[in-house]
Amino acid sequence: MIKIRENDRKDIIHLSFIPDSGAEKNSDPISFRWGDETVLTQTELAFLPQKTYRYVCDGEPVVKKKMTANGEVSYIENMEILPDGDAYSVRLRFKAGKDELLMGLGQYEDGIINKRNSRVYIYESNMRIGIPFLLTTAHYGILIDSESSMIFESRDDEIEFSIDTAYSFSYYVFLGTDMGKIIKLLYEVTGMPSMLPSWAFGYIQSRERYRSEEELKETADGFRSRGIPVDCIVQDWYSWGEGLWGNKTFDSSRYPDLPSAVKYLHDSDIHFMVSIWPNMSPDCDDFKEFKKAGRLLPNSNVYDAFDEEARKLYWSQCRRQIMESGTDALWCDNSEPFSDADWSGERKKPEEERYRAVMDTSRMSMKWDKLNSYSLYHAKGIYENWRRDYPEKRVVNLTRSGYTGCWRYGTILWSGDITASFDTMKKQIAEGINASLSGIVYWTLDIGGFFVVDDKYENRGCNDREHKPLWFWHGDYNEGVKDPAYRELYVRWLQFGAFLPVFRSHGTDTPREPWQFGEAGDRFYDTIVEFIRLRYRLMPYIYSLAAAAHMKGEIMMRSLLMDFPDDDEAGKISDEYMFGPAFLVAPVTEHMYYSPGSVELKDVPKKRSVYLPKGCGWYDYYTGEYHEGGTRVYADAVIEKMPLFVRTGSVVPMAVKKVPMSTKDLKADTVMVYKGADGAFDLYSDSGDGYAFEKGEYSLTAFRYSDKEQVLSTGNEGDTDRFDICFTGR
């Protein structure tokens, strides 16, 4: 076995290993130190020989088609398995401390942040985003430099990675003062998060699905006539003609003049996002073009995103059929295109079985050592070609899966097709934290849950005609928005969503527009509208957080441990988080007014227990009431409020005087200062779109607050005169 140290840095250590021949095992310890302390020791690296195989057609192909939850899938029935060469599986073991928290590794379903004494199957599927980056509280992180499926396992003080297929192997160890520093080292190796346009941080309205350009226009009119801010409306699947799954040409009978419809949205300062798929019906023109070019993955109707020419062809279809209509964003759905073996059936399979099923299916069409990275190459093709053809528009790619480094390609990742329940919502808080600790800055979810109904099959969406149980289709609300219990859940979820990096409503079974939950004067409707407006009041702060992510590697949605590493209690909290440096967010995750089935609840306290970390003081955002850190409070949690606290020393730029209907021409006019500690914040501003900022065309206003003097300054005399300065606290 040949070991190569790839660099001489002390904070980024890159080790590569090449097997000589046969089975090889290296048990010579390799230690990694932070200061005078050994924080991690490699105890074993083993290459285990294995055969790889490929699937070829036996004679004339017998092509079969079937509909799945991920659309139309084609496969060749008469496949033959042939040897394809020699490879290895890799076993990598470390000895670590017994007390540090083990975090990251992507986003999953179980809502568990600390992975100690657990097994994590790192693969790509609906509701799973596998990122082989382990972040710890002991000054180190580990990045596995592989595109293969793999398994992580922790047992007491032992950490093990089992990589399914490799020909050689390397990994990185990052060493730093804190978790934030280690994430910045990750970005140094994999690329910085890209800068999205300002509108991408506004409210995004989606549903499964708008069925015509008239519905798109009516939705835009609904927002503008009611004075509700919105920045984007989304066209989900089935924009194509009947039976032409994945074709990028819109059905002309329902969308007779798409450019005109998009212009209608643009005239109201509303952007347009379109769902696109990598799998295409063999009957559609896009598929035929790929087949003629020989750019499909074997045994599939999925384009070969690993191939540069295939990526160019896919983009050319997007450009001429979608982008030229004026579309502002692409939604790359089903970007893990071989997950149907998991995403089917009445029974949720055990984790090992799910992992093997997806891996076995993927192996029939992809190279075995690249089963996790399809979405990465898919995003790469969108980004590189978009940047060449539309430099005036920043890339926006909403994608269901991603892999290490996908953040440099203009991606927004969402958590997949989750169910509508408070249990799911609570787990999603932890999974959003997990995603951020894995390097994913722009994370979001389906506000209200994607699947809403349970067994009232006639209320199902997605053109579902089978009316049979499916393990993933088990929401708590058979009547959807007609059930006040669902309206309560939706409001709580939207409050949570207003404090995520990307603010997006989506789902099936029931409509999602604000007016579906009532009209002015109804507490559900009024609360929805108020939190959308609050999002826009905070937009100068939020857009500045995005700039800090792009320029400095600061993540937006933060575990409490990021800001309070010395608070042991903070490490136990999985249902609160920091949104930037100022806000502690504590979503409400239980019914207080109704239970499913329109059952009104009596005498349920409208309070939420919130832990406020030590090391600073905290202000209730709504009342300004002060609380000492290191305490637990029972915050007011009536439906109109989500518990929200602001840290002492926070400087928060806002747009207060006039809440805009979109992010266009958005400017900060007020700065909120929360007394009790010194503070700082850099207000970022640019044109909001395009890439001129890369040439220095942006401005930074560096606010600095001295609590002793109770003075806010910028270093430039007269700068603060542009803002109303509002102080909170003693």
Residue spans for each PLM region:
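Catalytic-domain carbohydrate-binding cleft regions of carbohydrate-active enzymes
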Residues: 2-22, 26-54, 58-634, 638-640
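Accessory, solvent-exposed terminal regions and/or long lumenal/extracellular loops of proteins
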Residues: 641-730
